Structures are given as C-alpha cells and as structure tokens.
C-alpha cells in the first residue's frame, strides 16, 4: 500500500490487485478498493478462477495466476506501454535469496525485468509498515503468510530469524547486493 500511496499522487496511475482466494483475500480486496475510491485511482482486480493442479506448489500456482493476470492487463491497448510497479521489499529479497539458495540457485529478485519494476527492494518491510502507520495508509497482512507449511513462510519465520542471530547485518549485506545488482531486461 505504501507504493500505491506514493504513486497515487501522480496522474494516470492505475492499481492492479489480484485476489488469490485465500481466507482473508476478500478483506485485502475491500481495503484496496476503498483506498482507490478515496484517492480516485483506477483499480483492476483479478481473481483465481481455477483450482490448482495436483502435485503443484500452491505458491507457484498463485504466482503464475497473478502474473498471467498482470500480462492480460498489460496486453490491453491502454496499458501496453505502462510499467508495472510491484511492492517487493528487502525482506522479500532475503527470503527469495534463501529460498533459491536452498534449491541451488541463490538468485536475487531483479529490480527490473521487462515491464516489471520493483523500486522498494532496498527498503525493509518494517520501514514500509512504519511509514504506512505514520501517514495513515491502510494495509492488510494476509494471515496465510504465517502458515509455515509454505516454504517461503518457513524461511520467513524460522530461517531468517536464525540467520539474523548468526549475522545481524544480513539485511545490510543484501541491500548492498540489491543496489549493486544489474538490471535484468527481457
């Protein structure tokens, strides 16, 4: 919501929200709708419209569905040349790096890939939450983010705190990696 608030002061901004169909996804959708109505921001909403295939990671399925919707929006004439700004932050970078490292890759989230821009990658989630509180910008945390049966959530709640005990400067190190990483252009 912080990124939307920053951008909502500009003209010609539209918000794209994707409802993953989780228990509290409707609550998030309502919050985004209200915010966009209050700030006169155009809103496009996508929703999961099929069941995930068996033997497929639910997280991967949700991500694929979300980006498929983004691409559908991006292919409409009105939005064809418009960049998409996602709200990934530094905590996501650390989690993704650990996640991909466990799978033998160790990749960072790129700050730019094709039409997708991620300007908040060097900013901690707590800083964004604090900013939202101070500026009375509403946001909602999806309760499914606490479910450690999902690998990324396990990393977030179990591995990252342990890594911080060993190296309290991990976010500083990762911020430097983000700031020095090359931009990926598709």
Where do the language-model regions lie?
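Core alpha/beta nucleotide-donor-binding catalytic domains of modification enzymes
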Residues: 1-157
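ATP/NTP-dependent adenylation/nucleotidyl-transfer catalytic domains that generate, transfer
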Residues: 149-186
């Amino acid at each position: 919501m912080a990124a939307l608030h920053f951008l909502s002061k500009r003209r010609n901004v539209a918000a794209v929200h994707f409802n993953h169909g989780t228990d509290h996804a409707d609550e998030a959708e309502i919050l985004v709708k209200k915010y966009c109505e209050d700030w006169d921001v155009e809103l496009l909403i996508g929703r999961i419209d099929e069941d995930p295939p068996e033997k497929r990671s639910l997280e991967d399925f949700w991500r694929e569905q979300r980006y498929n919707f983004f691409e559908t929006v991006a292919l409409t004439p009105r939005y064809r040349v418009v960049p998409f700004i996602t709200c990934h932050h530094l905590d996501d970078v650390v989690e993704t790096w650990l996640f991909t490292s466990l799978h033998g890759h160790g990749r960072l989230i790129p700050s730019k890939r094709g039409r997708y821009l991620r300007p908040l990658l060097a900013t901690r989630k707590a800083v964004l939450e604090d900013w939202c509180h101070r500026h009375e910008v509403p946001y909602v945390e999806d309760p499914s983010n606490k479910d450690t049966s999902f690998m990324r959530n396990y990393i977030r709640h179990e591995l990252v705190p342990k890594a911080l005990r060993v190296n309290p400067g991990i976010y500083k190190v990762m911020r430097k990696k983000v700031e020095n990483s090359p931009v990926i252009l598709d």
